[in-house]
C-alpha cells in the first residue's frame, strides 16, 4: 500500500513544484513562504554574501549538504525499518499467506475477524509492526517542506546575489544549462536504480517507473529554470545515491543478524518433527539389517 501511494504523491509534488510561483513580490506571503521559503532565502544569502565571498554556487552545495545531513537520522531510520520488515516478512510469508487465504475464504464477519486476529498474532510472533511500516513515508513527508523551500528560492531566483554573481564552474546560475540539466537527470536515474535494487519483486515495477519518471520530470523543469536549480538537484541526488547505497549495505547486514533468531525458531518449529522422524527411520532400518 505504501509503495502504491508513492507514485501519485511524487507526481502531485512535481505538479505543485512546477505550478507555484514566488517570482513576483506580491505573491511572497502566506504560511509556506514565511515558514520555509523566506528562511532558506536568508540562509543562502548569508552564506553566499558573508561567508563565501559571493560564491553562490558553493553556497548552494553547502546548504544542500547541510540540509541532507540534518535529515539523515530520519532517512536512516526509514532504511532500517524497511530492511527489518523485509527480512522478517521473508520468514513470516508462508504463515501470512495461509491466513490471508483464510480471510479471502471467510464467509462471515466472525470468520474474517478471527483470521485477522490470527494474522496479528503472527505479526506479534515475528515482532512486526504494520503501522510502523505504513509510517515509512513519514521521514520523506517531514523533509519535503524544507527541501521545497530551498527549491522555490532557486527556481524563482529570490536571492539577489544569484543575479549579481551568477558564474560558477562553466555555467551561469541564473540561466538554464543543458549539461547540468543532463547531470541532474542522470543522477536521479541512478538514485532511483539504487533504491529499486533492494525492493521486493512485487514492488520493483514501481521502482522501475520511478527510474523513468523522476529524471524526465527533473529534466523538464530544469530546462526552463535557472541552472542553480539543476545544481541543487545534482548535489541532492549525488548525496542520496551514496546515502542509499551504503545504508542498504549496512542495514541489510543488521536486519539479517537481528532476524536470525526468528529464522532458527521457524526452522525448529517446522523441521523438528521431520528430523525426529528421519532419525527413527534410520534406527528402524538398522534393526532390520541386523
Swiss-Prot record:
Domain of life: Bacteria
Residues covered by region (Disordered): 270-290
Keyword Transport: yes
Topology class, membrane: Multi-pass membrane protein
Lipid-bearing positions (S-diacylglycerol cysteine): 20
GO molecular function: membrane insertase activity
Subcellular localization(s) per the UniProt record: Cell membrane
Family recorded in the similarity comment: Belongs to the OXA1/ALB3/YidC family. Type 2 subfamily.
Protein name: Membrane protein insertase YidC
